Amino acid sequence: MNDQPRMSKMRRYHAAVWDEPVIMEMGSKGRRGLVFREAEKKVADAVGPAELLIPQGMQREDPPNLPELSEQEVQRHYLHLSQETLGMMGISLFGTCTMKYNPRINEIIAARPEIAETHPLQDVQTLQGTLELIHNFDLILRELSGMDNFVFQAGGGAHAAYTHCCVTRAYHAERGELAQRNEIITSIQAHPCNPATAAAAGFDVITLPLEENGYPSTDALREAVSSRTAALLINNPDDMGIYNPEITDWVDIVHDAGGLCFYDHANFNGVMGKIRARELGFDACMYMLHKTFGAPKGGGGPAVGAYGCSKDLAPFLPCPV
């Protein structure tokens, strides 16, 4: 009998691979996942036809182009997709824009007590290492973006976009133009946090539609810009990965009208090292450090929205707390 210990043979990583069509190509006509019951007669008599509850201008003229599948088919479809979406520690579900791989060493460093267990009210002398990290990373982001200042208070991308909306308000208020400049322009394919934070900050939102090339036309922007324009909030590339090659013209148009330009770098992976926001003319930008960079994301740690701006906007940045 061989007393030598048995060595397990390492296998190459493998996961399920399905030849899965997109859901719009699946199903059969007339198939249903849920069949609604007919309304009781008393309810129907009291409420009337359901279509009368929808304003005429909002009623569809044609039936929606939706796939017709059973509940089991939908469940099986997304189960197959989930089995092909494996990360280092299991399924990776979280994220709306360009994702990337976080080396495990990054997760280990971020979980160290010197970082994860700091408190904003502890003795500043015990935070010098953390402050040095933040300062050095500030300089790195300035190099990548061309901006003059960065702050790291924002707890995520939407928070950083809201920071810019507040900076925009303060900038125009200082110039005596806040009452006039009440509109922020974005596109329908920009990250949803851009129109949402603009509205939360009290601005009216103008959303530009897409053309066949995948981004709004420059003429549409010209029509939207006016003396009421406070800022342009835009992703480039957008959330479909399409880069707008006319972006410098957009910046010039908004600047000529007295507005500010904000670059949402949610999809920075594709352009890092190729462009710099400030050199394109943008006044401010933000990075989600849980996307292009190594901060943990999802349940693994807090997000960070690094907000950078030109020296003209620096006086309106939030102060450290």
For each feature predicted by the language model, list its residue ranges:
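Conserved PLP-enzyme active-site core in the AAT-like
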Residues: 128-129, 159-321
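N-terminal glycine-rich, Lys/His-bearing helix-loop that initiates the first secondary-structure elements
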Residues: 1-117
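Acidic-glycine-rich active-site phosphate/pyrophosphate-binding loop
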Residues: 131-143, 318-321
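Gly-rich Lys/Arg/Thr-decorated short loops/hinges at beta-loop-alpha junctions or inter-strand turns
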Residues: 56-60, 112-125, 143, 199-208, ...
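Flexible, glycine/charged-enriched surface loops at secondary-structure junctions
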Residues: 88-93, 148-152, 265
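Short acidic-aromatic active-site loops that bind/stabilize oxyanions
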Residues: 67-68, 123-135, 154, 158, ...
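Short loop-beta-helix segment that forms the pyridoxal 5′-phosphate
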Residues: 142-166
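Glycine- and small hydrophobic-enriched segments that form the cores of compact globular domains
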Residues: 107-109, 113-114, 121, 128, ...
